[in-house]
Amino acid sequence: MSGGKGGKAGSAAKASQTRSAKAGLTFPVGRVHRLLRRGNYAQRIGSGAPVYLTAVLEYLAAEILELAGNAARDNKKSRIIPRHLQLAIRNDDELNKLLGNVTIAQGGVLPNIHQNLLPKKSAKPSASQEL
């Protein structure tokens, strides 16, 4: 009999693969699962829930960082700062709705001038001004 674990003799041991790698994700599925278990959100956590949640978090992070990178490039900067995150989120309708109540430190405000404060455009002088 061969020693060790059962199976075919001479077969190479398969290297373990993380759940993140199996799902094709960069964010850690195991850590999200641990946080879900320790967070007292439910008594039991299914095996697919942390994978799905991790995929959603990774997608949101990629979306925000892409828009913030575009904002940084528009401002001729190579580093993303909180101002670029603020501009990216507030100029996107869906992200603004999702993060509407979120305050970003050092984010500033969107440039906006109310219509009532803008100077009135006069196409031609009125009859009272001609006399």
UniProtKB/Swiss-Prot annotation:
Q: A single Gene Ontology molecular function, please?
A: DNA binding
Q: Which UniProt keywords apply?
A: Acetylation, Chromosome, DNA damage, DNA repair, DNA-binding, Methylation, Nucleosome core, Nucleus, Phosphoprotein
- Give the Phosphoserine positions (modified residues): 128
Indicate where the modification N-acetylserine is found in the sequence: 2
Q: Which domain of life is it from?
A: Eukaryota
One cellular component (GO) term of this entry: nucleosome
Q: Name one GO biological process term.
A: DNA repair
Xref: SMART domains: H2A (SM00414)
Q: Which InterPro entries would you find in this protein's record?
A: Histone-fold, Histone_H2A, Histone_H2A/H2B/H3, Histone_H2A_C, Histone_H2A_CS
List residues modified as N6-acetyllysine: 5, 8
Site (Not ubiquitinated): give the residues. Answer: 120
Note the PANTHER family from the entry: HISTONE H2A
What is the protein's quaternary organization? The nucleosome is a histone octamer containing two molecules each of H2A, H2B, H3 and H4 assembled in one H3-H4 heterotetramer and two H2A-H2B heterodimers. The octamer wraps approximately 147 bp of DNA.
What name goes with this protein? Histone H2A.1
Query: What is the source species?
Result: Candida glabrata (strain ATCC 2001 / BCRC 20586 / JCM 3761 / NBRC 0622 / NRRL Y-65 / CBS 138)
User: Which gene holds the coding sequence for this protein?
Assistant: HTA1
